Amino acid sequence: MNQTLLSSFGTPFERVENALAALREGRGVMVLDDEDRENEGDMIFPAETMTVEQMALTIRHGSGIVCLCITDDRRKQLDLPMMVENNTSAYGTGFTVTIEAAEGVTTGVSAADRITTVRAAIADGAKPSDLNRPGHVFPLRAQAGGVLTRGGHTEATIDLMTLAGFKPAGVLCELTNDDGTMARAPECIEFANKHNMALVTIEDLVAYRQAHERKAS
């Protein structure tokens, strides 16, 4: 990632700390991966605190595929099978079957309905019957070990939520341009500045976690 582009957001460690602070303040974070990987920016929000307005922003400016990142333990708690047995996608993205809240929604498509679905899925006592299948929210199962195991947006989301003190669950959606093309780093930076979002790269988060784990050992 071109560090010059990111310099206004601080050093790599500062970017992670700023992202954690933003999440605790109820703001979103733009997460960039490597230019040699997906080369995308994902808007992420804590599943616990994401507002209807933030969901609407995500739907309006994103790909439309609103994903709920969860751990494998949560996936098992909700009895959500993986979308396919043999995952042949380029990066092995861990989609489960899609979901909808069993109660409190209409068509499930609106920002408010998707928030209701997210909250139902992450509730402390959530059970499989709390969700209908299929639906309009796409759960993603994160790999154990986070970004140190897999350098994906899914794992970055779970790591950031955990480090910020939230439940290990977050909402993500890829940022797109007005013409429907994928937003790259310059557009992601412009969007983050416009919408008061912190910005961090997966590379930043890997370095941050490695440094903290070295200290802990």
Swiss-Prot record:
Pfam families per record: DHBP_synthase
Residues that, per the record, bind Mg(2+) 2: E38, H153
Q: What is its EC number?
A: 4.1.99.12
Q: Does the keyword Magnesium apply?
A: yes
Cited NCBIfam families: ribB
Q: Record-annotated residues binding D-ribulose 5-phosphate?
A: R37, E38, D42, R150, G151, G152, H153, T154, E174
Of which family is this protein a member? Belongs to the DHBP synthase family.
**Which residues hold Mg(2+) 1?**
E38
Arranged from A to Z, the UniProt key words for this protein are: Lyase, Magnesium, Manganese, Metal-binding, Riboflavin biosynthesis
Q: Which HAMAP family match?
A: RibB (MF_00180)
What is the protein name for this chain?
Answer: 3,4-dihydroxy-2-butanone 4-phosphate synthase
Its needed co-factors are: Mg(2+); Mn(2+)
- Biological function: Catalyzes the conversion of D-ribulose 5-phosphate to formate and 3,4-dihydroxy-2-butanone 4-phosphate.
